[in-house]
């Protein structure tokens, strides 16, 4: 990996270069030869008697050595042509950037503005704009072709194997197909079961799809808080998060420089960016929830639509009449957006303006194809509060709002908890599917216990794997810093890897046709002592190699038929291979399908003698290995 | 925490002293006032309006400042009196220690022998020796009284609350009672549904129970391999593992000094120690599985029975006729013991001597009350091999052997996988319960995917939580080093904490009457911004505090009503508390059970005005906090 040192030190330095033994490849869909759909090919060692493995690649141009990265200029804006060629949009002079957009930051503390300015696009009345509208009209967009190709992970149609995988899994009623076609994508979007978050102004985007009949996705939250962090750190975190597999990134920045931070992130992000607009709206009224107004909020929506944000978390389900339901909770309201709106509702004794103006919100978002992520402002914040009436009352309202947004032509997903013990997780998934007409579910964890601050990536990774299996479409990561502080770069990586594990475990359990290919490739590498392949096929080759190197650092150990865990004499894989090799030399079917039977006694006696003969020679000398390590260290 | 520096540097240095804000307390059972059952009391801050929280304590005398720890002398041998007073045992001159017991280690590499020598005890013919025999005879032993007290976590009988918790959980047919009595313990042991691993020669033991109607337990594997590690490191790892919550420890040492390492561990261990005797037997024939004999193995069993090992993993289910079933596996046989026995069976073309001599093995183990941990030598080593015929054929044989061992009066648990995707986990649990007559299940993970070497504590923590919920009685930890190298001290801690999370999440989901008390206490601390209480109530107070200190290091921040994650303006818990406090001042029931209704409009208008008045004053100034941090760092 190369850390790019930027000559201008005020600009973000980001990590570029391919992952170990990987190269970027691009698939070209038959139906759209101008598209280049990225994949990462993991290159196996010469000892491998199998092809290289293509895997899903969220990392964007940063891992393509042929692309020159200039954070100052942003990524290529390829997708603008797709939007323009289908028409129905206009370029216009966007809203001016005002001092309050950046929290009235003083000149001394203002972050450097992003250099380039792009005029925004918006939809014209009477024209189709959103992916949902195109899908319903039977039109397959380039975005749909792109994600179809991407979801197949570079494999060709192999119906028999794919169907066997599906039959072996348990998907709880999902309809994962053996192979993803653009038409399948279109159909799922038309039914509201999947979304492609893709603001027409986010031209740097490599489209991806969220829905339970596709690969399970993960989101990484970044963003500064009022207490710590900077623009540079946040852009770096975004690039770092997608390097390890984040499918979308939410910029949850608060405090000053909020507009500028988001601009830098968007112009450099190949993945969808989500935000919670109420955070910025609150900055515009100096942090006083009571002073929030619909006009301030609307202004913020338009500002962020023009920038290119792909999905908005909107807590429109926090209704005045539900707030008292949280009164007896152990941890009250734990959603930032939820608590802000609760305070507003109570202070004014009015229904939430997000609820009363929901129609208008839809009309704005539709013009830019910004997807809804209907926020769960009343999600539980502790095991004690899971699945209570407040939570489910809000979920029912989110179902009602889903249908309104769909009628308006908007794409929708639904946010979910939070903190839920294992036995109450499936109830959440089932109720969400029922109330929200199978709109994609997007949950935060859930944490399955509250007793491990510092390890909430794990308490929640358990719940995330389970709810992903049950049908959740996207899992919002939780880092080790959850409840304790703002995650740094290392926390972001740990959170992303943990959630890639959860998402992949879910895909495996659902029987996703391509999921087990990677497990099997890695298992074969492990069994055949191709250590380097084992590292490189894993989610984090750097960490795997460094752990191995701690005890067996020499290059020769990368082909050794053992590791330091058991040592050479006790390596079960080695012994098993000895057994197999030996059985093969006998070339006698009876040695494989062996039973205790007199008829093959002669063969067995011969086998027995040969084994004795092999004796000690099949093992390496452990003490010698130890000495050689000592000499080296 | 204090790191004990031993004046004699050739002896192990171990970690002593209480955990942060904790003190050791001892409960005295009504029915045995001479027993002192350890608990750890977490002392809450003065701001807490609730009592201190007692939690299960595996750490032994090491965390009791009133006990002087001398690793050279070993722990007090309190339990010897319990064994002697019930009679039926004899002291005798044990087997001599031979050079091959320590792998014929040369004088230059020999570890220092443990100083004290204790003559072993063994059962006399015609007398009851094992907990199973006593239980069946209706006799409640001190061990049973001890574990009953321990399992209740210091709580009194509160039937109503306990029954509500049980009713709220889903235990899949377990029979967890509202309160544990010694008679319940006796009955569960008599039925074979639980075991107390307690060799009569492990007099340092603080007894514990393993069974699905008790708290879910975890095991930590330690032990040197031929390539790395030393006696000192292993004793330190044992003490370190139990400090963080390991309920039992397996010494999986191989290589030289194997007898001496085990002696040091046993004499200093308050938790049950398990081993895999075939590892040492193999050392006695220079690592050649083909040269293994029943006599060598039997000699090893007696050696370890006399030392005080509490449970033996015995791979007696790896039968000759099953070995060919592994031929087409992706990863063959991955159990060390399983592969050793497979090689022996094939080389000799004979049934495994562990199977043919099973009766004799029972007779030996019964005399010392060593529990069986029937090994799963044919467990899957990859997702591809999960739940295959080889695995389940062996499990059926383990069921057959369970009944033989029970007939002989031995306590039994059953080992399980390994590598299993989520949707195939419950099948394992259900089949084990059926085949093995509800004998406790003890699984390694299982790992739910193979694609994350370096993170297998997480891939397996997911599976462990699930199988614990489904009924698994003990979860064998997996560390981040799994498949890559021998775990060090940090890996041991990470593995233990991860598995404490899994076990606790399982207990919560089962509805264990006492499990949620800790979650609720921590959640209340979190909501009330008692930061120090939040850290101390967690599984790893040191890590939680250090994460918090990274961004808010000052003592004043330990009472701040926000953290660096969201900052003061966006802290949902703060806002919620503001809302509640405000509602409380109105002293009007309508403000809690508020609805949109004209009748309380006046109250609401008043509320609205007051909220406006509170305005900006309820928030701390984020920028000021940031500055103060900068000044400090």
Curated annotation (Swiss-Prot), chains A, B:
UniProt-listed InterPro entries: ThiC, ThiC-associated_dom, ThiC/Bza_core_dom, ThiC/BzaA/B
Catalytic activity, reaction form: 5-amino-1-(5-phospho-beta-D-ribosyl)imidazole + S-adenosyl-L-methionine = 4-amino-2-methyl-5-(phosphooxymethyl)pyrimidine + CO + 5'-deoxyadenosine + formate + L-methionine + 3 H(+)
Cofactor details (free text): Binds 1 [4Fe-4S] cluster per subunit. The cluster is coordinated with 3 cysteines and an exchangeable S-adenosyl-L-methionine.
Skewed-composition ranges (Polar residues): 1-13
EC number(s) per entry: 4.1.99.17
Region of interest (Disordered), ranges: 1-20
Record keywords: 4Fe-4S, Iron, Iron-sulfur, Lyase, Metal-binding, S-adenosyl-L-methionine, Thiamine biosynthesis, Zinc
Transmembrane segments: none
Binding residue positions for Zn(2+): 419, 483
GO MF term list: 4 iron, 4 sulfur cluster binding; carbon-carbon lyase activity; zinc ion binding
Source species, domain of life: Bacteria
Record-level GO BP terms: thiamine biosynthetic process; thiamine diphosphate biosynthetic process
Binding site for substrate: 221, 250, 279, 315, 335-337, 376-379, 415, 442
Residues binding [4Fe-4S] cluster: 563, 566, 571
Cofactor: [4Fe-4S] cluster
GO cellular component terms, A-Z: cytosol
Function: Catalyzes the synthesis of the hydroxymethylpyrimidine phosphate (HMP-P) moiety of thiamine from aminoimidazole ribotide (AIR) in a radical S-adenosyl-L-methionine (SAM)-dependent reaction.
Family membership noted in the UniProt record: Belongs to the ThiC family.
Subunit structure: Homodimer.
This protein's name: Phosphomethylpyrimidine synthase
Source organism (scientific name): Bradyrhizobium sp. (strain ORS 278)
């Amino acid at each position: 990996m190369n850390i790019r040192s930027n000559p201008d030190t005020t600009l973000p330095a980001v990590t570029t270069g391919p992952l170990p033994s990987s190269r970027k490849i691009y698939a070209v869909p038959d139906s759209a030869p101008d598209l280049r759909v990225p994949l990462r090919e993991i290159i196996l060692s010469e000892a491998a008697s199998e092809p290289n493995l293509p895997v899903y690649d969220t990392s964007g141009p940063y891992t393509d050595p042929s692309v020159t990265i200039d954070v100052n200029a942003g990524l290529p804006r390829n997708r603008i042509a797709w939007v323009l060629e289908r028409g129905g949009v206009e370029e216009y002079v966007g809203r001016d950037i005002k001092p309050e957009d950046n929290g009235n930051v003083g000149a001394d503390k203002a972050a450097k503005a992003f250099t380039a300015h792009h005029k925004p696009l918006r939809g014209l009345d009477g024209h189709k704009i959103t992916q949902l509208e195109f899908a319903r009209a039977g039109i397959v967009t380039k975005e749909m072709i792109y994600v179809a190709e991407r979801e197949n992970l570079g494999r060709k149609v192999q119906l028999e194997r794919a169907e066997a995988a599906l039959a072996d899994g348990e998907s709880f009623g999902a309809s994962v197909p053996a192979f993803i076609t653009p038409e399948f994508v279109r159909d799922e979007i038309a039914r509201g079961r999947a979304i492609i978050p893709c603001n027409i102004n986010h031209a740097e985007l490599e489209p991806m799809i969220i829905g339970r009949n596709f690969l399970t996705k993960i989101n990484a939250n970044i963003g500064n808080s009022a207490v710590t962090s900077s623009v540079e750190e946040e852009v770096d975190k975004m690039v770092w998060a997608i390097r390890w597999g984040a499918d979308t990134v939410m910029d949850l920045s608060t405090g000053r420089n909020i507009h500028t931070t988001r601009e830098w992130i968007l112009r450099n992000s190949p993945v969808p960016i989500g935000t919670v607009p109420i955070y910025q709206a609150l900055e515009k009224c100096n942090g006083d929830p009571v002073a929030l107004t619909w006009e301030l909020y609307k202004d913020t929506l338009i500002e962020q639509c023009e920038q290119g944000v792909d999905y908005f978390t909107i807590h429109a389900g926090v209704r005045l009449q539900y707030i008292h339901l949280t009164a007896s909770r152990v941890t009250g309201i734990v959603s930032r957006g939820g608590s802000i709106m609760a305070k507003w509702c109570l202070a004014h004794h009015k229904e939430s303006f997000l609820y009363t103006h929901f129609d208008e919100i839809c009309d704005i978002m539709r013009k830019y194809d910004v997807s809804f992520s209907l926020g769960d402002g009343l999600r539980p914040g502790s095991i004690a509060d899971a699945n209570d009436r407040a939570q489910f009352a809000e979920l029912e309202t989110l179902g009602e709002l889903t249908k309104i947004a769909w009628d308006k032509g908007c794409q929708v997903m639904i946010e979910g908890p939070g903190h839920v013990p294992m036995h109450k997780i499936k109830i959440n998934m089932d109720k969400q599917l029922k109330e929200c007409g199978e709109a994609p579910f997007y949950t935060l964890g859930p944490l399955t216990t509250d007793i491990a601050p510092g390890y909430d990536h794990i308490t929640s990774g358990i719940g995330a794997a389970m709810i992903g299996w049950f049908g959740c479409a996207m899992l919002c990561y939780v880092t080790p810093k959850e409840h304790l502080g703002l995650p740094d770069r290392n926390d972001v990586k740990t959170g992303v890897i943990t959630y890639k594990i959860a998402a992949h475990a879910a895909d495996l359990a659902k029987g996703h046709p391509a999921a087990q290919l990677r497990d099997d490739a890695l298992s074969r590498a492990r069994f055949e002592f191709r250590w380097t392949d084992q590292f490189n096929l894993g989610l984090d080759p750097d960490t795997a190699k460094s752990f191995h190197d701690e005890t067996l650092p020499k290059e020769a150990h990368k082909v050794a038929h053992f590791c330091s865990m058991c040592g050479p004499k006790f390596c079960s894989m080695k012994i098993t291979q000895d057994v197999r090799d030996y059985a093969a030399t006998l070339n006698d079917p009876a040695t494989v399908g062996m039973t205790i039977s007199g008829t093959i006694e002669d063969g067995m006696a011969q086998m027995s003698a040969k084994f004795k003969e092999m004796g000690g020679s099949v093992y390496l000398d452990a003490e010698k290995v130890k000495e050689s390590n000592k000499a080296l260290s």
